[in-house]
Amino acid sequence: MNEMGLARRSAAFLDYLDQLVAGLPEASLREVIERAGGPQRVAVMVVDVINGFCKFGSLASERVGQIVPPTARLLEAARDLGVTRVAVLRDSHHPEAPEFEQFAPHCQDGTEEAALVDELAGLSHAHTFADFPKNAISAWHGHDAVSDWAAGQEEEGVSTFIVCGDCTDLCVYQTAMALKLTANARNRQATVVVSAETVETYDLPVDVAQRLGAMPHDGDLLHAVFLYHLRLNGVQVVRRLA
């Protein structure tokens, strides 16, 4: 049995994670679209950029809220380059959602917490966004609307999906991996792109979590680990899409 603690055993890997995140390349949105074959072959999926995670409520996080401006800029830039396919996935929970046993009650259906943030809802093309409320971390579980939408995009020629939102290790990870793994299972080529500038996760320090009787959540570590894991599975992870 190795008596060294995890921090010591994994020191080299943690250094690697630091270097990986610090060295993420910047990518050109225009070039991503061109490589896909044009804007008609690109779709953007916006995951949980809603009030209850970005602005107010039991699970709102200031660090998560910081992704709102770059996400709005990305959507505007994609629109200006001709991308018209945008889907919004939103936590919109039943009042007795089983998920509330793991996470404090949040983003209940019909509340302001479950609404898209104003910065995105106020975009000139927001009325064209496909809107998918969800009752679980993964929108691929419990109903077929999102998976049917994604499959429909592929059937219409979409080859590249850009995923942004929160949280890196939860809903964003589930969304990006579902797109990639579904394509793999069908023996199809699909490009999934995640810009670190437009994804984030929350932080709950150990001492605070212990006082609350909750599980701690190291935001910096888990953000880095899940960016790594997305890249490990073939998702293109970049620092930002300029």
Where on the chain are the PLM-derived regions?
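Generic enzyme active-site microenvironment
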Residues: 45-46, 50, 89, 195
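Short acidic, Gly/Ser-rich segments with clustered Asp/Glu that frequently serve as metal-coordination loops
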Residues: 49-57
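Short coil/turn segments at secondary-structure boundaries
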Residues: 58-65, 103-111
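A short alpha/beta connector and helix-capping loop motif
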Residues: 40, 44, 57-93
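Active-site-adjacent betaalpha module
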Residues: 1-43, 77, 94, 105-242
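Short, solvent-exposed loop/turn segments at secondary-structure junctions
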Residues: 51-52, 93-95
